[in-house]
């Protein structure tokens, strides 16, 4: 992450070949909009449908693979650091 707290990105790929298995030290929220991809989380595979949301905690192995190139691969990705997430939790205590 470039920011110390959080980042949000919109991606639109006409040709996506996948990424290798990896982890992060931050939380990842993945909002799937369009495409034909499978996300693998800790070796469990899920074919994504438009509107699906995936939450990936820090340290969890994951990767995305393209199933076909018939549609653009569109998604929002939101990353939030563990420290900032903890600050938000503390602010929302009753």
Go through each PLM region and give its residues.
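Conserved metal-binding segment of the jelly-roll/cupin
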Residues: 48-65
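Generic protein-terminus/edge-of-domain signal
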Residues: 1-53, 90-93
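Residue-level recognition of the GNAT/N-acetyltransferase active site
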Residues: 42, 57, 81
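A hydrophobic/aromatic-rich effector-binding and dimerization subdomain
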Residues: 1-10, 61-94
């Amino acid at each position: 992450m470039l920011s110390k707290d959080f980042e949000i990105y919109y991606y639109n790929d006409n040709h996506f070949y996948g990424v290798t298995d990896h982890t992060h030290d931050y939380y990842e929220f993945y909002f799937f909009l369009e495409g034909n991809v499978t996300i693998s989380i800790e070796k469990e595979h899920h074919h994504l449908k438009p509107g699906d949301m995936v939450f990936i905690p820090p340290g969890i192995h994951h990767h995305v693979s393209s199933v076909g190139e018939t549609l653009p691969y569109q998604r929002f990705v939101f990353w939030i650091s563990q420290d900032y997430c903890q600050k938000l939790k503390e602010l929302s205590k009753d």
